[in-house]
Design a protein with these regions (language model features):
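Carbohydrate-associated surface elements
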Residues: 109, 130
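Aromatic "clamp/platform" in nucleotide-sugar-dependent glycosyltransferases that forms part
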Residues: 250
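Short hydrophobic beta-strand element within catalytic cores of glycosyltransferases
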Residues: 267-270, 280, 287-289
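A short helix/loop element that forms part of the nucleotide-sugar donor recognition site in Leloir-type
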Residues: 137-155
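A short, well-ordered alpha-helix in the C-terminal region of glycosyltransferases
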Residues: 316-319, 330, 336-337, 344-358
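Short alpha-helical donor nucleotide-sugar binding micro-motif in glycosyltransferases
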Residues: 237-242
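Nucleotide-activated donor-binding/catalytic signature segment of Leloir-type glycosyltransferases, i.e.
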Residues: 207-230
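Conserved donor-binding/catalytic core segment of Leloir-type glycosyltransferases
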Residues: 156-172, 178-181, 194, 319
Length: 380
């Protein structure tokens, strides 16, 4: 089997790039002849089509990337398999995707989104995202690399470090976590809440709003926002430095960092919805808060990134649930349980590590990819 993997290559620290890069690594370790290419580079892709002649192309992205992941290779008569995430709804390319022999999606929730918005599901298979469980491992708090992370973030050795990581923090549920911490503040052990966000123009105003919320709640002295650029090499140490990973995300098609936190032996706070129903086990590897609110959308303004002219108004036949809000009181209760009980944190962390290795290791995912392609397309 010869496979061309299309993604954000060379890989940035982002989730989609990591998703593609770990599949590539897993395939190569299995002995599969696999090569990477940037999903937007028409010239590079055509070069591979001509000399490599891949049996199959797998492309990482979402429905809006269909021209790059599917249409380009179809002009050359090569089988293309998009491996898709979801952004809450699907608003174009239904006929093109429905006609494909195979579509991969990152969770059962993503599959439901695509079926809700026009696909039959007959050609959709769930393939979860891989995790490098050799890098994301439990580490001792006294390890100088771990102690240095905590010290640099202003976290004392005896403080409970709660961590959220994302492009921005609000979309990962930071507002709900802050409100929960404000409820617990005077009753809880000493704590520090760290939000690691990616430096980009769209998040600057969001970060200010988040910090204003912390001030309004009276917990701003215990909330730290860090916006430095970091590589994937740093992430295992950042996650291993925390005591609790909190990400009751508002929109989560899979939840890669939640799995990485579990792989580091950390308990996770999530929400009982979306991709987290696939990745986390309530009461065992994580605590999943109930959904308190569903946010529905009647219309959206789209542009060329979605295959429309700029400013196109797309009206849904029925309002779509596009994201969720977790129960603040559930989060508060679960945080208190974990903050007060080191043994519970350790036990849930061990279960999380075990599940991450068994179900989400990148080698497991690569093997599953080969099995699906062989069964569905008869390519070996």
């Amino acid at each position: 089997m010869k496979v061309l993997v299309l993604y954000d290559y060379p890989p940035s620290p982002g989730g989609l790039a990591t998703q593609g890069d770990l599949l590539l690594r897993g395939l190569r370790e299995m002995g599969v002849d696999a090569h990477p290419a940037n999903f937007e580079s028409a010239q590079e892709k055509e070069w591979y089509y001509r000399w490599f002649a891949p049996d199959v192309i797998v492309g990482v992205g979402y429905w809006g990337h269909t021209p790059h992941l599917v249409l380009h290779s179809q002009r050359y008569g090569i089988t293309s398999i998009p491996w898709l995430v979801a952004n809450g709804y699907m608003a174009n390319y239904q006929e093109i995707l429905e006609a494909l022999p195979l579509i991969l999606v990152t969770s059962n929730w993503v599959k439901k989104i695509y079926m809700r918005d026009g696909l039959s599901g007959k050609n959709i298979e769930v393939l979860h995202v891989g995790c490098d469980t050799d890098s994301f491992i439990p580490r001792d708090k006294n390890d100088p690399k771990i102690a240095s992370v905590r010290e640099a973030l202003g976290v004392a050795p005896d403080q409970i470090m709660i961590l959220t990581v994302g492009g921005d923090a609000a979309s990962k549920g930071a507002h709900e976590v802050m409100q929960a911490l404000a409820i617990n503040d005077t009753k809880a052990p000493d704590w520090k809440y760290i939000c690691k966000v990616w430096p980009q123009p769209r998040t600057e105003q969001q970060n200010l709003a988040d910090l204003q919320l912390a001030a309004n709640l009276g917990i701003d002295k215990n909330v730290v926002y860090t916006t430095s650029r970091v590589s994937r090499n740093f992430m295992p140490y950042l996650l291993a430095a925390c005591d609790i990973y909190a990400a009751p995300s508002r929109l989560e098609g899979f939840g890669m960092i939640q799995i990485e936190a579990n792989a580091c032996g950390k308990p996770v706070i999530g929400v009982k919805a979306m991709g987290m129903l696939d990745t986390l086990v309530h009461g065992k590897t994580a605590f999943l808060a109930d959904v308190a609110q569903e946010i529905r959308l009647r219309e959206a303004f789209l542009g060329d990134e979605s295959g429309y002219e700029s400013g196109h108004k797309f009206v849904f036949k029925r309002p779509r649930i596009v994201d969720y809000r977790a129960s603040v009181h559930d989060i508060a209760n679960y945080l208190m349980d974990l903050m007060q009980n080191a043994k519970l944190r350790e036990e849930m962390g061990k279960e999380g590590r075990k599940r991450a290795v068994e179900h989400f290791d990148y080698r497991v995912i690569a093997k599953r990819f080969v099995e699906i392609v062989s069964k569905r397309l008869g390519i070996s």
